[in-house]
Amino acid sequence: YELEEDWFGPFTFENNKSKEVMWSVQSQYAKGTLFQWQFERYNHYNAKNYFDLSGYSSTNGMHLQPSLKPNGDPYTDKLGRPFAKFHAKDLRKKLYVYKGNGKYEGMFLYGKLQRISRSGTEVKCTGLYEYPGEVLEFVDQVAQFKKVKDGEYSSVNELPSNISTGEENSGIRLCKLPVPDNTDKTLAFNSDYPVLRFAEIYYMLAECKYRSGYKKEAANLFNEVRKRNFENEVDPDPVTETNIDKYRILDEWMVEFLGEQRRRTDLRRWGLYTTG
């Protein structure tokens, strides 16, 4: 096994051939064995229109933990805030767009979901509930902003933010596994779901090195994985002997394995599952 050169290597439509994926759950359009729950749960009901992919539905059921308060101020908790933890120059922190022939860029849906498709038509994700017919703008916040416009709250500073006060556009959406458009529809959900990646072995060894007092060696292992996430492998914020600690390590685990069902295990291992 070896690390892929590109960040998307372990997740492509042909990731069954990836040298980094050590164990995966098979998904194949032709055989009808589709692993599509991430698409169904992360995406808005009308996200299929933005993707320009017909025939699939989604439940608007999940999004990333917010990084910002309703008034736009950042949360200051050391843990969590996943979208904010991605560096601005991280190639993954782009709006997801399918480019054709199995190629794509970005790993998230955020901002206004409106673009010109490969066929030249305008595609967009429009609202159904709080913002019916409007092009939705997905925000890194959770609050019922419509109630400020309607006069129920005088300002965003008064808005509560919890699991019951979201709107249909609340939260950043994760596209860890790629989604094609109608032109390449037979690729839909052909990505196997990675259960274990070789990058995880790097991170396990890095954590062991850190716990044994070898901070520099630990940092180097994290950086071997990190560098592919930046243009020309120039990492603007590498892990170093001086900035590595348990919080930086947990951030590295979170960012690299976001959406891969590791977070609870990692927090429990460090005794931080019930803290901020």
Residue ranges and their predicted role:
Residues 225-235:
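Short, mixed-charge aromatic SLiMs
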Residues 231-232, 255-256, 276:
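Membrane-interface anchoring segments and C-terminal beta-barrel signals
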Residues 8, 28, 230, 254, ...:
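An acidic- and aromatic-residue-enriched active-site/binding cleft used to recognize and process polar
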Residues 2-6, 233-236, 259-260:
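Acidic/polar loop patches that form or flank catalytic/metal-binding clefts of enzymes
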Residues 2-198, 275-276:
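Elongated scaffold/linker segments in the mid-to-C-terminal portions of large proteins
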